[in-house]
Regions:
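Glycine-rich, hydrophobic membrane-spanning regions of integral membrane proteins that mediate transport
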Residues: 2-347, 351, 355
Length: 356
């Protein structure tokens, strides 16, 4: 009650419609306004790219795209197996050397790599999986996915199942009774078996698919190209023609080159501007520490992705799609959008005072 009385007494003396600005003089308000404008100007200057920053980003994107076009190329089936650009052929050769065919064949036939999700046709299934064959079983079985396999594949090994998304987009998880002896009861043994199976499959003629490639079997829509194919059919055709995990690794190199050029150039520029070396190392994308880096990477990967889109358009060949490049573009686009819409506004939580 005393608090209410005091408030009423204060309102009777001062009034009830006081504004914060009323406690400042006109000169102080003007000074505050100028200070806020200066802070906003300095803030924008810190985050604004200069000509050198833009040039670094553009060059990095162009170099990465050039490596993709000239050295990665498009895989094609030749007399000696899959062939593409110089870099792709080099990477594939290194995989073949690291995983020799005779050793991988022995591993594939050993119990340590036998998994329940490796059926190559429908003879041992209880629920039919459309498209299951020696050509497509690794694309359809999620246990063969280089990412999902560590979850779905390990689960299948522990439960004696095979989990698939078939060619028509139907999700099927079924117990493989004929492969009951391939189960493991220990999660570590299951993980070891999963890795052994990956190893045995990686250099086969129809090898491991690119990460998450099997999920595209769900995309039963679209009318693309001369044959009016769905997205799923396009991806299935890409896998058949050699768009596999090894090619994914080859395509990742131009993306890494773009990334490295931007980050190293950014660090050199920061050091030349007088920043400490430890403050210039561009590992973090924290905009408080490196205010321009994320934007530079976004521009670089946007440029490289635009060039790749042009490559796909002019060749009319989906095999020209650089999957890792589009993943990088999506990642940095999300970060840039989040920065522009949410984080930037929260950092600039300074508004000019209302003048009366």
């Amino acid at each position: 009650a005393s608090d209410v009385y005091k408030r009423q007494e204060a309102e009777s003396v001062v009034g009830g419609s006081c504004e914060l600005e009323s406690i400042f003089t006109e000169a102080e308000l003007k000074s505050n306004e100028l200070a806020i404008q200066q802070l906003n100007k300095e803030y924008n200057q810190i985050h604004k790219l200069d000509k050198t920053d833009i040039a670094i980003s553009a060059i990095a994107g162009i170099v990465g795209a050039a490596v993709d076009i000239l050295m990665v190329g498009i895989p094609q089936k030749g007399p000696e197996g899959l062939e593409a650009g110089t870099l792709s052929n080099f990477i594939r050769k290194k995989f073949d050397e690291a995983f020799p065919a005779d050793e991988m064949e022995k591993l594939a036939n050993s119990k340590e790599s036998k998994v329940p999700f490796d059926a190559q046709d429908n003879r041992n299934t209880t629920i039919r999986v459309e498209g299951l064959s020696a050509y497509y079983h690794r694309l359809l079985s999620l246990g063969h996915d280089p990412l999902l396999g560590f979850v779905v594949g390990v689960f299948d090994i522990l439960t004696g199942r095979m989990t698939t998304i078939d060619k028509t987009g139907k999700f099927v998880s079924q117990v493989m009774e004929n492969y009951a002896d391939r189960k493991e009861s220990n999660i570590f043994a299951a993980l070891a078996k999963q890795l052994a199976h990956f190893k045995s499959d990686i250099t086969t003629s129809m090898g491991l698919p690119a990460p998450l490639m099997g999920v595209f079997n769900l995309f039963q829509f679209g009318s693309i190209g001369e044959y009016e194919q769905t997205v799923a059919e396009i991806v299935q055709g890409m896998y058949y023609e050699g768009y596999d995990f090894i090619h994914f690794c080859s395509m990742s190199i131009p993306v890494m080159i773009t990334e490295v050029i931007v980050r190293i150039s950014y660090a050199i520029k920061r050091i030349n501007e007088g920043k400490r070396i430890c403050d210039s190392i561009p590992f973090s994308l924290n905009r408080e520490k490196h205010p321009k880096l994320a934007t530079m990477l976004f521009i670089a990967h946007s440029g490289a992705t635009a060039i790749n889109a042009g490559k796909v358009y002019f060749t009319k060949n989906p095999m020209a799609i650089n999957y890792p490049q589009w993943v990088a573009f999506a990642k940095y686009s999300y970060k840039q959008l989040k920065w522009g819409v949410v984080e930037k506004l929260s950092l600039i939580h300074i508004s000019e005072p209302t003048r009366h």
